[in-house]
Amino acid sequence: ALCALGTFAFSALDGTARMIRTTLNTYYEENNLADFWITLPTANRSALEKVAALPDVKEVCARASTDLDTTLPGDVSVSVTVYDGEMTINKPLLREGELLEANDPRGCLVEERFAQSKGLSLGDRLTVKLNGQQYPFTIRGIVVSPEYIVVTDGMAANPDQYGFILVNSCAIPELPLTQIVATMADGTQSDAVQAEIESVLPDALVVDRTAHMSTARANNDAQMFENMTLIFPVLAYAVAALIVMTTLSR
């Protein structure tokens, strides 16, 4: 019976683990998750062109990302990601409303769990503060994002106190672009492409998927479930073997 239980546990856990991994990879692919997050003092056109010119780089996009306080009740902050142009990399998955037009200076997209926690809906106002100045936004859409599967302020995910919003660069022109996100061509190796990027941008901090916090945590959770497919069946077989040995020794 224990051997049968072990076989059943392996089949069930293996099927679930494969489904989780396939779902995660499909989600990343369909929403064009970045392979690299490149942080530098200024993500100007020259830096963007240097990365785009690399033979193993497929797409690039300049943006900025920073934590800002809001005017919401309580000590609430958001990670504000500012895109220069269309959001072609790390494309948000729309839950409600509509995506931003590239020239929309007052619209924003809000992360779903944060919106639910704070009771935010389409058309509501959300105001962030930068250098003593307030920037009011109208919520155009409720979204989830492949790069924010795990939303955290560095310690723990808490949608009551922390979330993310997406806006266009024209919405906060005072915020300098300091990040480039990039995808690599099919069939290339991450380490090799990262070395190419670092060679043309020696002052940049280059992070790949294995070091990106949310992506790494999501992959670690999937890997942990895959490891469970081996542990529990082995335990069942080990207990069964122990029972047989004990019985025979008598």
Where are the regions that the model predicts?
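Membrane transport/envelope proteins' first extracytoplasmic loop
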Residues: 1-241, 245, 250
